[in-house]
Every structure is written in C-alpha cells, then in structure tokens.
Amino acid sequence: MKSFCVKAPAKINLFLHVVDKKETGYHLIEGLFVFANLSNFLEIKVGEKDSRYDNSTVEFINSESKINNQYNTVMKAVNLLLRHAPVRTKVTVKVVKNIPIAAGLGSGSSDAGAVVRTLGKLWEIDRTILNEIALNVGADVPASVDSKPVFVRGIGEELCHIKKFSLPTNVVLVKPKKRFLSTPEVFSKHEGKFSEPIKWSDDAEKDLLKLLKETRNDLQEIAISFVPEIKDVISTLESQEGSILSRMSGSGVSCFGIFDSEENAKAAAVNIGKKQPEWWVCDTQLIV
C-alpha cells in the first residue's frame, strides 16, 4: 500500500465575470483565481494491485456540515481516475476539513484537485486526460490541480497561468458562520447583462491591482440578496487599516480583504474576530 499526505489550498476568486451562457445551461466565466495557505489535508492510500476498486472510500473529518461519503467531488475524482489506473486497485481518502464548505472558497474543488494531482502523478496519466477528468468533476477543479495563480476562461477549462504576481499576498478571509450558498442557485439568478470579455495579455500581470479595480464579482449582488450580511462583511474589511481591496469570493458567502502588510492583516483579523464573534475569520497568505 502507498500512502500520501497532501494539502488542498483554499481558492479565492479575486474577480469573477459572467460573460455568456451556453445552451446547455452552463455559464461562461472569466476570473482570476488564487490559492491560500489555508488548506484541507488529505491522506490518500492506494491499495495493492487486484484490490476491489469498488471498495474505495472517502471520509470527511471536522466538516462544519455533513457531507455524503458516496456522492462528493473526491469520490467522483477517484472513480474517474481509477479507469486509468494501470492495475485494479482501491483508494481510500481521509479529508480533514479546514476550509468552510459552500462558501466560495473551493473546499470541495480543491480536495478533488489534490486527488487528481496525486493519483495522476502516481499512475502517470496524461495531462490532457487529467484536465478532462478535472473538468468532469467540477468547473473549479482544473485550476485547483496546480493551485497556482491563474486567469480562467470558459466553464473553467481555459487556463492562463500568471507568470509574475504583482499583488501583496496578505489576505483576511471572513464568512458569517452557519451561512451557506448553493453555487447553482446563485448562478441561476444571474439574469442581467453579461460582462464584456477581457483581452488578457502579459501586460495585465504587470499591474494586477489596477486590473482588480476595473473588475468585480458579477455574483456579489445576487449573493447579497440571499445573505445581506455579506455587505456588512465587505464594508468591515474595507474599514480596516491597511486594506487595499475587499470583495466576495466565488458565489459566496466568504469575502476576502487584501492588505498592505502581514502585520495589518493579522491585526484586522483579530479586530474583526473580537467585534464579530458570529463570523469565521482567518488571516492567511496567498501561494504565488
């Protein structure tokens, strides 16, 4: 048996535009995805050859709400990857959850990305096939395989990796406790005008802060209509010393604030946590 202990970093959408909708119902997006040191931890065990693959299991530990052990992103990724395993085997995964679920931080997508990355390398699966598997599991999973700053287009399959990250890496994440949002439900309420596609180039990387100030999260107002408290979270982050930019991540409910220094980020997290005990607060660093 082979055993691996791997991290699944939190995903943050620095901006998210909805640019179109396909006849299939899928929305086409553009966005800048980054990943943080805040991580789930996975223990992945691969059995000896000729093990019964249908005995593969996933167990979630420390999750704030119950996750179905049979129907989840990790099990879906495992089952798809097993089709390309060189021998019949089984996989068991234990996931220690530190990233809030259903919160716009890619907790499930990052777990699946870590599984795709680990088993893909072990079984030497072609990267094209891995990308197809990742997209089949979920729209955010392709970006989560490498967990590096990336400009994302389409459903989530078009990736342009950021060569030079020109932003501070000090971040505070805030989420109202016991508040969750369904990604499909939030997207289903997007009925407004689509955003114009961005002409992405290397020049955009030179001043990412300028780019962020010219962009937004098209799902933010929709999410606020479900959870008005999101607006309070953003204004609280904006009011902290050293705050550079604050907005919602993904389809919510989590929000992020970028800060000019680690000291100010840590102070902001402490301050917000004291004033708002009903909010989950975490200061962390972006992975660049």
From Swiss-Prot:
Q: What are the UniProt keywords, alphabetically?
A: ATP-binding, Isoprene biosynthesis, Kinase, Nucleotide-binding, Transferase
Q: What biological process terms from GO does the record include?
A: isopentenyl diphosphate biosynthetic process, methylerythritol 4-phosphate pathway; terpenoid biosynthetic process
Q: Which residues form the active site?
A: K11, D140
Q: Which positions are annotated as binding ATP?
A: P100, I101, A102, A103, G104, L105, G106, S107, G108, S109, S110
Stored SUPFAM superfamilies: GHMP Kinase, C-terminal domain, Ribosomal protein S5 domain 2-like
Protein EC: 2.7.1.148
A molecular function (GO) held by this record is: 4-(cytidine 5'-diphospho)-2-C-methyl-D-erythritol kinase activity
List, alphabetically, the InterPro entries matched.
GHMP_kinase_C_dom (IPR013750), GHMP_kinase_C_sf (IPR036554), GHMP_kinase_N_dom (IPR006204), IspE (IPR004424), Ribosomal_Su5_D2-typ_SF (IPR020568), Ribsml_uS5_D2-typ_fold_subgr (IPR014721)
Pathway membership: Isoprenoid biosynthesis; isopentenyl diphosphate biosynthesis via DXP pathway; isopentenyl diphosphate from 1-deoxy-D-xylulose 5-phosphate: step 3/6
Q: Which reaction does it catalyse?
A: 4-CDP-2-C-methyl-D-erythritol + ATP = 4-CDP-2-C-methyl-D-erythritol 2-phosphate + ADP + H(+)
Q: Which family does it belong to?
A: Belongs to the GHMP kinase family. IspE subfamily.
Function as written in the Swiss-Prot or TrEMBL entry: Catalyzes the phosphorylation of the position 2 hydroxy group of 4-diphosphocytidyl-2C-methyl-D-erythritol.
Q: What is this protein called?
A: 4-diphosphocytidyl-2-C-methyl-D-erythritol kinase
What species is this protein from? Answer: Wolbachia sp. subsp. Drosophila simulans (strain wRi)
Gene giving rise to this polypeptide: ispE
